[in-house]
């Protein structure tokens, strides 16, 4: 069938030294490829599966790109996931939160709720950001801090409703909560000079979404 053909093509490309990415909605294809990989390719393979007891982490706010670009790309993913219920206030708050965390340099997606609800943590993140960008993020956080507690809860409620189904799940927090995961996507696209190193970077990435175990929204976020 189609899965058998896809597995054959992926293995063929891997054997030929090409970079391979397989995103599998069900997980069966990833399992098939992983069990058939030649031994010499195993060290160059990353299997991303949120169902693992100790999953490989993904930090979309870090890894080989500018903080602002990382924040914008992740914002676009959330906007596409929740297009039917996306509003300007949610856009504004999430954008400022992602930018602030990405510019921090050691943050993760799982910190967004903490940033919005914990004053002490928020000050530790936004202090330097406000100084460096007083007209942009500085103005946003000044507005946010000026809100009453009730106004703040009302403002962030739509965003928190979107984040909770993902970040309340332990296996997804284990994936998105790693600030410095061992694998970053930019490693897959490193130049050929890096491939000549004694420890070559990953060339094969197998992503098991397993929608039945993760849920639609979580699987879409992981796949994006």
Placement of each model-derived feature along the sequence:
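Conserved lysine of the Walker
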Residues: 2
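P-loop NTPase motor domains
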Residues: 5-224
């Amino acid at each position: 069938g189609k899965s058998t053909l896809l597995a054959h093509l992926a293995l063929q490309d891997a054997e030929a030294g090409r970079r391979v990415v397989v995103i599998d909605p069900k997980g069966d294809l990833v399992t098939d490829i992983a069990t058939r990989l030649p031994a010499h390719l195993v060290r160059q393979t990353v299997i991303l599966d949120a169902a693992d007891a100790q999953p490989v982490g993904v930090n979309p706010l870090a890894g080989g790109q500018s903080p602002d670009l990382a924040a914008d790309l992740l914002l676009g993913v959330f906007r596409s996931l929740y297009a039917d219920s996306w509003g300007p206030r949610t856009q504004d708050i999430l954008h400022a939160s992602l930018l602030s965390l990405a510019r921090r340099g050691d943050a993760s997606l799982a910190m967004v709720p903490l940033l919005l609800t914990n004053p002490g943590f928020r000050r530790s993140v936004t202090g330097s950001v406000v100084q460096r960008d007083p007209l942009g993020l500085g103005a946003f956080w000044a507005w946010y801090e000026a809100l009453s507690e009730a106004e703040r809860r009302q403002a962030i409620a739509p965003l928190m409703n979107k984040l909770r189904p993902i970040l309340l799940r332990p296996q997804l927090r284990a994936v998105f909560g790693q600030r410095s995961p061992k694998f970053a996507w930019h490693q897959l696209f490193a130049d050929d000079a890096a491939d000549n190193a004694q420890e070559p970077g990953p060339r094969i990435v197998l992503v098991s979404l397993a929608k039945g175990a993760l849920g639609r929204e979580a699987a879409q976020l992981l796949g994006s």
